[in-house]
Amino acid sequence: MSSIHEVVALIEELYSPHPKHDVNQIQQSLQSIQKSEQGFHLANELLSDDKYSANVKYFGALTLTVQLNTRGENDYETLWNVFRSNLLYLTKFSTLYVSNPNMYGQSLIIIKKLMSNLSLIFTKINDPQLNNAGNENMIKQWNNPINTFIQLMSVQNQNINADQLLLDSINCSLTYEQLSQFVSLSQKHNELALTFTEVIVEDLTKFQTKRHSMSQIHEVVHEHLYISTMALINLNLTAQAVFNPTVFDCITAWINYISLTRSVSSSGRMDLSEIFQNLIDLMYQSTEGSDGYENAEKILTIFGNVFANDPLLMSYDLRQQIECIFLGVVRPDSGITDISNKNSWMLQYMNYLVTNDFFSELKELAICIVDFLQINTLSVCNKLFTNIQAADNGQVQDEYIQEYIKVLLQMTNFPLTPVLQEFFSVRMVDFWLDLSDAYTNLASETLRPNSIELSTQIFQQLINIYLPKISLSVKQRIIEEEGESTSVNEFEDFRNAVSDLAQSLWSILGNDNLTNVLIDGMGQMPAASDETLIIKDTDVLFRIETMCFVLNTILVDMTLSESPWIKNIVDANKFFNQNVISVFQTGFQTSASTKVSQILKLDFVRTSTTLIGTLAGYFKQEPFQLNPYVEALFQGLHTCTNFTSKNEQEKISNDKLEVMVIKTVSTLCETCREELTPYLMHFISFLNTVIMPDSNVSHFTRTKLVRSIGYVVQCQVSNGPEEQAKYILQLTNLLSGSIEHCLASSVQLQEQQDYINCLLYCISELATSLIQPTEIIENDALLQRLSEFQSFWSSDPLQIRSKIMCTIDKVLDNSIYCKNSAFVEIGCLIVGKGLNLPDGEPYFLKYNMSEVMNFVLRHVPNCELATCLPYFVYLLEKLISEFRKELTPQEFDFMFEKILLVYYDAYIINDPDLLQMTIGFVNNVLDVKPGLAIGSKHWTSFILPQFLKLIPSREKFTIVAVAKFWTKLINNKKYNQEELTTVRQQVSSIGGDLVYQIMYGLFHTQRSDLNSYTDLLRALVAKFPIEAREWLVAVLPQICNNPAGHEKFINKLLITRGSRAAGNVILQWWLDCTTLPNYQG
């Protein structure tokens, strides 16, 4: 070992703010010394010499920890030596500390480390698994470290180096008087005793998660340390002298320990009732004048921890007292007196927090009280609405209930700004949600006679309280005072939680007492004072926006198109529709010159557009109401497209507005197709404007608008297919013409490429919107003219299909676009749009098999195979699925040769993605029509031998795909008898090779890929049980040398007959042969 001076120098350098050498090297050097045989002696040297600094002495205590963990586990002599030293030095430094805390204040960190060491020793000594060996003189149990500590501190003037004195103190007994006398010596004596017991249970709480069993340790704690500590804590809580706040940390540690151990300890319940009662009494004594409510705040933190994590630690009687303090009401039969004084303390405390703007402390109080209320929401529910807890005196009971309701609502309606200043209303949302759920689940026979009236009264008041609480005026104030802080996010969460609460309350209040009330509140008076529909009174604007926000949540899950009720209530509120539009218009016209105005502008538009979209079903009943909404929405879009500001934030805001509006337009068009027919030409005219490349509109809006128009075009059925085709032709000419005009430019910059890609997506969106939204049988108008539509679109007299194909060909014939996967993807998407639609459905974009094949053959040779080929192959998969009845093996061969086989050796085999794609293509054929592949001339000459070689691949996706191929080949329910016979013969002929490749791949694979091989092997054993034995017997010796394991494996595997149990057998063989442990075992 280095000299003591060198070690001390290293320690001082380690703890210095600017060490000269590498800290890691210093740590490694010191750690090697700590773990060595000289470590114990080093610790004693560092702790015994008074000239060393606190850092050096702390390192000495830390060295005892290292010795304890490295050498004290199995060596009793080391354990005893470390135990002895810890007791000696704890007594030494504690004596110095209590004698002069100012001079020896730095010793406290050393004292706590020594206490932590003794805590670990306490655990080791009392663990029978650790001390079951050793000599007879070995200490088998250490009952009470607090008694030991007090005893040693009491005999400090004697020679405590004497081992006998130490041994006598280890399990000594102390009377209550001795304990009381010790803690009364000084505040520091008291503080050290509290700290020691706190350290012990904190460590025990940590150890509980690491050790399998600590039942005996818990028993020792329960019978000894618990009793002393409860006496110690209660002495502190009831002391008339100077109060020591350390007791609160000690109580918290013990609560956490008891909460953790009461479910695992067999020693019975460690009761905390006396402590809780003393805490309640002490809380009353904490006032503004006495300690500025400092103790009250700490006690409420303790209670909050109990209520949130383990409320049953507190007895029912104590919880009734707390209820009296928090709410000022108690059950008539509780026996609690002095109710008003108890609650007045809480009101004074709240007033103190509010008056002094202690909003953080007020938030903690709110959390504590609401956590208390949520301990047993069902009990509160029973109090209010059932006869289960009714008192004998009905009048007294009614008065109690009314008072209880009043307090709950007052707490919810706390008179400050939510989130920013008060948190009661925020946290109470969870309570009311739980209460409403509990109420809806009550058995009807238990309800009080007036429960329906009472619940309506409570929950309607609740809605009235929360509406102004979630107003955007609150959000405005938060942003003005704190900017875009976490408080804004908290407010948004609060607002959404209240809307969820309203949705939950609807099941109790229904339309009559909730939905209709909101609509009445919005529709009785005009919010805007002139024809511009701009709401100038901000209070009115905020109020109506809030009701719109909540109303949307309630309406969103209703089928309004089938609800006559909505028509009647809106008719009775003639300003409802106008006021919804006014919120939208006001939002759009709001200046966005400041951050807060930008945010609120978006909120107003978001709320109104969301509600307009939700009302789409209502407009099906009242189509004449659509006109002002459509005008407002397109006026909003027009405003967005004419946006000219260079301010980046304003541009971002404008883009968001545009997205909100076009989404709502799309929702209306999808739901109200027939009702919007009169606006169709207006929509197309607007599209003509925004489709131009110089239009200030996003690609998203262009594609959404085309889809929206397509919805309306789709329902143009009553006048025959010619009328529908007229609109489709007009739209395709517009889109195709714009694409071709752009392609004609000699330079294709990124801007032009993005524009063409957008227009292709517009064609795709148009094609999607023209697909029937329901089955044909549900569309009477189409059903009456079905044959007419089928004939028209089959012949396509306007040549719409060929025009669209021509446009796509022109794009992909371009040398830039043909190698860009984005254009290939959208091209294939459009061409395949009409594939796999229901039989007999007339559709304008159904290409036949030769047209699709010609498209693929035309563009594959020029594309970037690595990125583009998968889209063409996916299109072929759809083609095979669509024309599976007509396709022959010869046509499959043609596809396979021209699209895959020709590129296999040069490209596909070297690209895992393309390889997976190729195998997947064949798998798809086996799914759709297996005869196409099995009858192919390439089946036995290429597909089977190539896919056989791929089984032991190292690429995960290749393994998955090829295993799926062979599994599907072996076990396919879509074979006819001839195909089944052919496949069995083919598998039988290559069975040996197949099993070799499977077992070779299985043996060399990683564990995560075992399932693919397992599924394949299970299928083989299930379908070829007899042959499988022969194949395995022949193959396994070639894989690895484990004859006994192979025989066992074969026997077990065949017994499973391919069931799921085979998985465990295969796994065990793999583990045995790769010499890995089975961690599942």
From Swiss-Prot:
Belongs to the importin beta family. SUPFAM superfamilies: ARM repeat. One of its GO terms (biological process) is protein import into nucleus. It is found in: Nucleus envelope. InterPro entries: ARM-like, ARM-type_fold, Importin_beta-like_NTR. Its main location: nucleus. It comes from the Eukaryota. This is Importin beta-like protein KAP122. Associates with the nuclear pore complex (NPC). Interacts with GSP2, NUP1, NUP2, TOA1, TOA2 and WTM1. The keyword Transport applies.
